[in-house]
Every structure is written in C-alpha cells, then in structure tokens.
Amino acid sequence: MRKKVFVSGCFDMLHSGHISFLENAATYGDVYVGLGSDQTLFELKGRRPVNDENERLYMMKAINCVKSAFISQGSGILDFSEEIKRLRPDIFVVNQDGNIPQKQKLCEEQAIEYVILNRLPHEDLQIRSTTTLREIDKMPYRIDLAGGWLDQPFVSKHHQGCVITMSIAPTLEFNERSGMST
C-alpha cells in the first residue's frame, strides 16, 4: 500500500513551481492537499486570493499527481490540523518556505514523518513562485495631490509609473449630514 503524503498551501495563481512541488511530493506516495480557505489566505497574507477557494480546489483536483484535495476548515498557519488528524498521513511534505517549527511540532506529536523539499523547477523551466509572478505583474503607481498633470514630466524623472490624480475639497454636505463640526 502506498504511503499517504500530505501537503498544505494556498496554491493561488497556480504555476509550474506548484506542479513541480506536487510531483516531487508524489514520489513519496499518494498526495493529499489541504488548501487554505479564502479567509485564511486573507488572514495570513493580507490580501484576497486571485482564484477563490472553489476554483483553487477544482484546479488542484485536476492535477494527475494529486490523489485528493480539500479546503482546510481551520484558521491560521495550522488551518489543516483537524483534517490531518482524520487523514493520518505517513508523511508531511513542505518546501523551504513552508518549513516552520509549528508544522514540525505537529508532526512529532502525530508521529508523521516531516520532509522538506528544495524548490526545484521542472527541467528547462525557471524557479517560479507566486511572489515572483506578483512582482512581474505589479504596476507601480503614485498619488498626485499637488499639481496634477503639470508636474508629470518632473515627477516621472524620479519615479516612473501610472499616476492617480485627485482633488481634495471640503464636502460640506458630508460634514452637515454626519453631524461633524467644520
């Protein structure tokens, strides 16, 4: 009988680095994936996911090397702790980024082998992470509260990028309606 291998993560913006990690984990046995919920992702990373939990679950289940996947019901960094007790995996596989003392301790308490994988890309591909993908797509912006388009050439010499221009003016209606004094 093949061993049960557990992995956890958000797996938002699914990319070749995720697939390579899952394929490497599958060399240890059948892979079971605990996905962080949208709420957990927001709590841990301070942002909403690009793909919601149902879409991430659908994509994860479609990967050939994944035996089963589920959305973890807990919260925080060990959001999967109840599920791991029910699943009773033989091995918990993490990459270097996911290697934290809390996971090691949980594995010691549950008598689960703890394996740390290096981040290795599939042959002929570069190392990929969600963070690097987000950096590629990052659009620099600045807010111009001063001169509007007149200062654009000067400001662009120092920091290029999109500009959000806004005008700030008192709104008496808001102040009167909310009972605030002016």
Model-identified regions with their sequence ranges:
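Nucleotidyltransferase catalytic core that binds NTPs
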Residues: M1-R134
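ATP-binding N-lobe of GHMP and related small-molecule kinases
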Residues: E135-T182
